[in-house]
Amino acid sequence: MEDFVRQCFNPMIVELAEKAMKEYGEDPKIETNKFAAICTHLEVCFMYSDFHFINEQGESIIVELDDPNALLKHRFEIIEGRDRTMAWTVVNSICNTTGAEKPKFLPDLYDYKENRFIEIGVTRREVHIYYLEKANKIKSEKTHIHIFSFTGEEMATKADYTLDEESRARIKTRLFTIRQEMASRGLWDSFVSPKEAKKQLKKDLKSQGQCAGSPTKVSRRTSPALRILEPMWMDSNRTATLRASFLKCPKK
């Protein structure tokens, strides 16, 4: 699973996931399913934010190419992917600026158009079950919840899906691709079943250091959201090194 994660996800997402796990004393080499889940969640958060801006009239627009128009404002503030101290600093700043109620738990995004925090969920189970778990944990009507599954299902607070259908379809397609790639390597069952995960962990520990086959699809594109976050945690030389070493597994 660890090899799959490093091959399937953008190196910067992998780096952010490793930092997040180490912040909580977790080892990506051992808790590989959690490693995969965190990378998936990060990518969904960045895809959620990608290309969405607010123009001078306060309208939400989609711009897929880099636009020199400085009057455009990013619609979403990305909170996920930052260390806890920085994340709470961003949340406090948003609350002070917008008057939004401070959430009890760190959310993933802030939507400047709808003026609300957003909690993103990616589940391997039924979306309604995971939605209820999130809602019971957050216990706040102010935080909007949006859940995606690997089967293409989604659920959101008051059936308000925030994004246009095409943007959500991109996310669903990516999740389906990840599921298919895992399944083709015999990793999907262990990803969804704790019992199977233990078996897979034993296999992983025995075969550490060996490269798995390269996936048929790899997310090479750097998310615009990642380009915003990048200077906060990684210098350009380190980024170049990561990109140069991307997909370094030799073909068998």
Swiss-Prot record:
Record's keyword terms, sorted: Decay of host mRNAs by virus, Eukaryotic host gene expression shutoff by virus, Host cytoplasm, Host gene expression shutoff by virus, Host mRNA suppression by virus, Host nucleus, Host-virus interaction
Main location: host cell
Annotated site location: Important for efficient shutoff activity and nuclear localization: 195, 198-199
Keyword Plastid (UniProt): no
Origin superkingdom: Viruses
Cited Pfam families: Flu_PA
Compartment(s): Host cytoplasm; Host nucleus
KW Transmembrane helix (keyword) present: no
GO MF assignments: RNA binding
Catalytic-site annotation from UniProt: 80, 108
Residues of the site described as Important for efficient shutoff activity: 202-203, 206
GO biological process: one example: viral translational frameshifting
Similarity comment: Belongs to the influenza viruses PA-X family.
Function recorded in the entry: Plays a major role in the shutoff of the host protein expression by cleaving mRNAs probably via an endonuclease activity. This host shutoff allows the virus to escape from the host antiviral response. Hijacks host RNA splicing machinery to selectively target host RNAs containing introns for destruction. This may explain the preferential degradation of RNAs that have undergone co- or post-transcriptional processing.
Record remark: domains: The probable endonuclease active site in the N-terminus and the basic amino acid cluster in the C-terminus are important for the shutoff activity. The C-terminus acts as a nuclear localization signal. The C-terminus is recruited to host protein complexes involved in nuclear Pol II RNA processing.
Protein name (record): Protein PA-X
